[in-house]
Amino acid sequence: MKALTFPKSHRLLKPSDYSRVFNDVTLKVPHRNFLILASANSLGHARVGLIFSKKNLRLAVQRNRIKRQVRETFRLQPDLPGLDIIVLGRQGLDRLDNDTVRSSLNDLWHRVKKKYRQSTPDQSVGNPRGTE
């Protein structure tokens, strides 16, 4: 079993990482309170970046609470595909309680996985097992 940690290697750290995702969006998963943008990476694991503006979450306490929730739900998703993911906050996020935020994020992570599976071609179709 993998350790469910959140090391630096699972975060988008540089502005160039964010720019690459914004310029090459392959998956977009909308929600009333969040928007997830994702782009494939070659690392073999997912990385996440967070963008929560003062316009949508006025108080730093609110921004930090939501960011903690996003990081925690991301950390508990070890089976996410190799994607660079940006989570953007939308208006109305400050009115949600922690349980609602957590359930919304878990739903979004499942939608990301589902959309990724649908967008990538199945390798087993071209080469059925046992036939060579």
Curated annotation (Swiss-Prot):
EC number of the protein = 3.1.26.5
| UniProt keyword annotations, A-Z | Endonuclease, Hydrolase, Nuclease, RNA-binding, tRNA processing
What is the catalytic activity of this protein? Endonucleolytic cleavage of RNA, removing 5'-extranucleotides from tRNA precursor
One GO cellular component this record assigns the protein to is: ribonuclease P complex
- Example GO molecular function term? ribonuclease P activity
The domain of life for this entry's organism is Bacteria
Annotated GO biological process:
tRNA 5'-leader removal
Q: Which InterPro entries match?
A: Ribosomal_Su5_D2-typ_SF, Ribsml_uS5_D2-typ_fold_subgr, RNase_P, RNase_P_CS
The family database entries (PROSITE patterns) matched by this protein are listed as:
RIBONUCLEASE_P
- What's its job? RNaseP catalyzes the removal of the 5'-leader sequence from pre-tRNA to produce the mature 5'-terminus. It can also cleave other RNA substrates such as 4.5S RNA. The protein component plays an auxiliary but essential role in vivo by binding to the 5'-leader sequence and broadening the substrate specificity of the ribozyme.
Indicate the family of this protein: Belongs to the RnpA family.
| Quaternary structure and interacting proteins, as annotated | Consists of a catalytic RNA component (M1 or rnpB) and a protein subunit.
Q: Which NCBIfam families match?
A: rnpA
Q: What is this protein called?
A: Ribonuclease P protein component
Name the gene for this chain. Answer: rnpA
